From Swiss-Prot:
Family annotation (SUPFAM superfamilies): Chromo domain-like, SET domain
Gene Ontology annotations for the cellular component aspect, listed alphabetically: chromosome, centromeric region; heterochromatin; nuclear lamina; nucleoplasm; nucleus
The protein's name in its UniProt record: Histone-lysine N-methyltransferase SUV39H1
PTM sites of type Phosphoserine: 391
Positions of Zn(2+) 2 binding: 181, 195, 222, 226
Domain notes: Although the SET domain contains the active site of enzymatic activity, both pre-SET and post-SET domains are required for methyltransferase activity. The SET domain also participates in stable binding to heterochromatin.
Pfam families per UniProt: Chromo, Pre-SET, SET
Residues covered by region (Interaction with SIRT1): 1-89
An individual GO BP term: cell differentiation
Keyword Zinc: yes
């Protein structure tokens, strides 16, 4: 038995840092973990809990990484080398002092409630940083994700799993395309109109990868059966998000939002709306539950008929956090790539105008396109953000908080 186990390995359930902390707690050297007699008694600041000033000397109550709260100690500032943590502590302290007392200069001793707030804020930052790392570990796209909350003490959403593509529900099948194009150059020399032409539609992009079709018309991209390669100009949505984006807490009661950290050119692809694909019957059942909770993320796939719905409540990507606006900077398009079932399009967001770095990304939850255009996609009437009021029996009008000049005052 022992012979058969040679060469086997198992994953450790503790992180590298946690193992180092265990060594220091037990006062054990471990060269494999980088713990030697020289650094065995090196301590790392996890966060700062309190502040006081005695005469002209500043002191901080330090929570040490790997040690319980009871082992926290008061340390003079000159003993601390954690510049980033010190700066963040004072930034949080000054912001809260301004909010509470309309002044930013710290007192010689902090009120216990203020000290407790700073501890909760430090713990929140650590939780958000771990969540940010988790999101980036799971993403398959080029664009990085950052997370910020400078508004309240809310941490990562519970029971939300980041996914990069549709999660197919029970009884639903995504059939793979059987054929692809034979083009030498899909943009300039398309054979038989390339993949769009094979479906009797127009080529969607220009040579910069910007959509040139009007909203409501479908996009047919090259697929896994096509002769062309990854750099084909008709492969845009399938390459995923390429902009660095930030999930941030809004300061006007709209919950989480998303802003771009880079400039986005007009008509450029920004992101897909992904989640669980469920039947309309299942969507109706879930919608009644979500109504009672005051939160729902249902998106009808009604390109040709209303058979399926995307539910991003618990499984989704960064689009889960994009807010509504009556004057949005994102527009929805139906996209077909490896699955050509018109009842199951992929939902892609493109920029309606140039979007500046730092600007929030939004789309209209109650989208409308030209009524003569039957190839439309609209949000389900149940769509809403977490925390919005709702009723399982009688739909209430939800007040819009987008704040734009063209605001309709109500989402639905």
């Amino acid at each position: 038995m022992a012979e058969s186990l040679k060469g086997c390995s198992v994953c450790c359930k503790s992180s590298w840092n946690q193992l180092q902390d265990l060594c220091r707690l037990a006062k054990l050297s471990c060269p494999a973990l980088g713990i030697s007699k020289r650094n065995l008694y090196d301590f790392e600041v996890e966060y700062l809990c309190d502040y006081k000033k005695i005469r002209e000397q500043e002191y901080y109550l330090v929570k040490w990484r790997g040690y319980p709260d009871s082992e926290s100690t008061w340390e003079p500032r000159q003993n601390l080398k954690c510049v980033r943590i010190l700066k963040q502590f004072h930034k949080d302290l000054e912001r809260e002092l301004l909010r509470r007392h309309h002044r930013s200069k710290p007192p010689r001793h902090l009120d216990p409630s203020l000290a407790n707030y700073l501890v909760q804020k430090a713990k929140q930052r650590r939780a958000l940083r771990r969540w940010e790392q988790e999101l980036n570990a799971k993403r398959s796209h080029l664009g990085r994700i950052t997370v910020e909350n400078e508004v309240d003490l809310d941490g990562p959403p519970r029971a939300f799993v980041y996914i990069n593509e549709y999660r197919v529900g029970e009884g639903i099948t995504l059939n793979q395309v059987a054929v692809g194009c034979e083009c030498q150059d899909c943009l300039w020399a398309p054979a038989g109109g390339c993949c769009p032409g094979a479906s009797l539609h127009k080529f969607a992009y220009n040579d910069q990868g910007q959509v040139r079709l009007r909203a409501g018309l479908p996009i047919y991209e090259c697929n896994s059966r096509c002769r062309c390669g990854y750099d084909c100009p008709n492969r845009v949505v399938q390459k995923g998000i390429r902009y660095d984006l930030c999930i941030f807490r809004t300061d006007d009661g709209r919950g989480w939002g998303v802003r771009t950290l880079e400039k986005i050119r007009k008509n450029s692809f920004v992101m897909e709306y992904v989640g669980e694909i469920i039947t309309s019957e299942e969507a109706e059942r879930r919608g009644q539950i979500y109504d009672r909770q005051g939160a729902t993320y249902l998106f009808d796939l009604d390109y040709v008929e209303d058979v399926y719905t995307v539910d991003a409540a618990y499984y989704g990507n960064i689009s889960h956090f994009v807010n509504h606006s009556c004057d949005p900077n994102l527009q929805v398009y139906n996209v077909f790539i490896d699955n050509l079932d018109e009842r199951l399009p992929r939902i892609a967001f493109f920029a309606t105008r140039t979007i500046r770095a730092g600007e929030e990304l939004t789309f209209d939850y109650n989208m409308q396109v030209d009524p003569v255009d039957m190839e439309s996609t609209r949000m389900d009437s149940n769509f809403g953000l977490a925390g919005l009021p709702g009723s399982p029996k009688k739909r209430v009008r939800i007040e819009c908080k987008c704040g734009t000049e063209s605001c309709r005052k109500y989402l639905f």
